[in-house]
Amino acid sequence: MTTRTFVVTGLMAVIAWMALPGMTNLVVAQSSFSVYPVYDGFINNSDGTLTLSFAYFSHNREAVTIPIGPDNVFSPGPRNRGQPEMFLPGHHRWQCIVVVDEDFDGDFVWTLTHRGETTSTSTSMLQYSWELDGSGVVAVGRGFTPESSPRNTCVNRPPIVRVLGYGGRRGPDELRVPVGGELKLFGSVRDEGLPKGGMVTAEWRMVSGPGTTTFADATSARTLANFSASGTYELELLGSDSVFDETIRVTVVVE
């Protein structure tokens, strides 16, 4: 009974806050700015096909939903290519990866309309300046093969799983925490939103170690971990989009 009362009270408080003068306008203002579809560029594949990459940029401070339809459409051809419908704040590259056959003529435009403003991607898709190389090829080609991918629709790829402050060019190769201390794990699981209706999940587990590991919430990418004994542990964060799984392992030294 206490929990139920708390939830209802909290909801009523939010409703009351929304009813204050100017609050509704403030909430609307957080999502009333432009959302732009963006063309990242293309890759020439070895089998003669092309891989196209699309992104988006949102000036809003909260997520915006634009359902597939007149306001979220690819053309020519079918409107629905599996493109994103939820648009997070900021610039998000490689969000819709499309494989097209070698006879592609360069006409494949993504158009978004939000708050009365309509914007579209470039119509000059095959100019040499749009050809991706280096890190762009790696980012676009992650998790799929063009030869076996469906044509003319956004390809589902495994989620991107990372741990902030660990590995790579900027982070250490191991995390350290004193015995009895709590380790803050800043993980993230990012996905392009495919398959439609799928659920993106995260799960931490201990792979090895001299003791036990207790997570504050093992199903949250960002969580706290406690260790029962000193020594070296290996932890794993698994991210799933309900079809594909991706993992990253973290070495932790407890001393």
Task: Please give the residue ranges for each predicted region.
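Proline-centered linker/hinge motifs at extracellular inter-domain junctions
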Residues: 35, 131-136, 147-166
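Short, solvent-exposed loop/linker segments at the N-terminal edge
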Residues: 43-45, 175-183
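Residue-level recognition of secondary-structure-to-loop junctions
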Residues: 44, 102, 225-229
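Extracellular acidic, Ser/Thr/Pro-rich low-complexity tracts
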Residues: 56-60, 189-195, 208, 241
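Low-complexity "stalk/linker" and mucin-like segments enriched in Ser/Thr/Pro/Ala/Gly
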Residues: 84, 170-172, 196-199, 205-222
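A short beta-strand segment in extracellular, disulfide-stabilized domains
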Residues: 181-191
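C-terminal edge beta-strand
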Residues: 246-254
